[in-house]
Amino acid sequence: MTEVKHRTYSSLEPDAEYSGDLKDGKKHGHGTLIFNDGTKYVGEFKDNVIHGHGTLTYADGDVYVGGFSEDTEHGHCTFNWADGDEYIGEVKMGDRDGIGIFKFANGSVYSGEWKNNVYEGRGEYTTPNGSKYIGEYKDGERSGNGSSVWVSGHKYKGEYKGDELCGQGTFTFSDGSTVTGEWRDSKLNGYAIRYDAAGNIIQKGIYKDNEWLHDKVN
């Protein structure tokens, strides 16, 4: 899958020029910060820190619009990268955390749950050519129960682990025939039964790395 970017306000150099509201000598209310590299923040401040809603425009053209809490991105946001990537969703203390959509410049889209900047929980991933996965993620990888549909017409429904078909699952070919059984590393490993498009058993037995070890014809 396409690599997901990450960038936060805390990575900026501390030196910046401020213009805006003050309270008791502190930045408080609405104001603008301009950093030495040309990065600019326009938005709300509280007790001398960025807090509330604002827009952070990096010198290279990346733009964050959304919530902040004590100098850290927090709440709902839209983050547009100069190269065309876009994230719309929740952030928690600088990390994508909660529900969000990441639209990649190449046309891939992930929509679903996040934790600590990676896909975590339930989500949907669509590739530029229209292939799609819907199911569970763990640590940024497909893990748990899910289903995939490829542009070729092939389908899979079952278990995943570490971004691979792993566990029990059914693979449906574009011609309507199916194979149901045990998978590991996206290959049949274990007992499986193959059916034709009408549902008749063609073959059943033990597979290893997609090769039959023991063939039993019904």
Predicted segment positions?
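Glycine/tyrosine- and acidic-biased, solvent-exposed loop/turn segments at the edges of beta-strands
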Residues: 1-218
